[in-house]
């Protein structure tokens, strides 16, 4: 039985529900953590206290997605340069 035949046997409500779960899962596990990585990398040295607290809260909220993406991203902060 092919995948498309199996998919055609599923009701439209179930397909809509699966699509909604897929979109929300993609947002939670990939899209928002990527945006959070980008934001932290861009603003790390110029964040204020409130912004840093907000970003740490988002890191706590989207931790599973950040862990999934961490092996593929190298976001090391700038060091002191050569000593």
UniProtKB/Swiss-Prot annotation:
HAMAP family tied to this protein: NDH1_NDH1L (MF_01355)
Gene: ndhL
Family from the record: Belongs to the complex I NdhL subunit family.
Subunit structure: NDH-1 can be composed of about 15 different subunits; different subcomplexes with different compositions have been identified which probably have different functions.
Organism: Paulinella chromatophora
Role this protein plays: NDH-1 shuttles electrons from an unknown electron donor, via FMN and iron-sulfur (Fe-S) centers, to quinones in the respiratory and/or the photosynthetic chain. The immediate electron acceptor for the enzyme in this species is believed to be plastoquinone. Couples the redox reaction to proton translocation, and thus conserves the redox energy in a proton gradient.
Highest taxon, organism lineage: Eukaryota
Record InterPro entries: NADH-quinone_OxRdatse_su_L (IPR019654)
Keyword entries, A-Z: Membrane, NAD, NADP, Organellar chromatophore, Plastid, Plastoquinone, Quinone, Thylakoid, Translocase, Transmembrane, Transmembrane helix
GO cellular component terms listed in the entry, alphabetical order: organellar chromatophore thylakoid membrane; plastid
Stated name of the protein: NAD(P)H-quinone oxidoreductase subunit L, organellar chromatophore
Reactions performed catalytically: a plastoquinone + NADH + (n+1) H(+)(in) = a plastoquinol + NAD(+) + n H(+)(out); a plastoquinone + NADPH + (n+1) H(+)(in) = a plastoquinol + NADP(+) + n H(+)(out)
Primary localisation category: plastid
EC number(s) given by UniProt: 7.1.1.-
Subcellular location(s) of the protein: Plastid, Organellar chromatophore thylakoid membrane
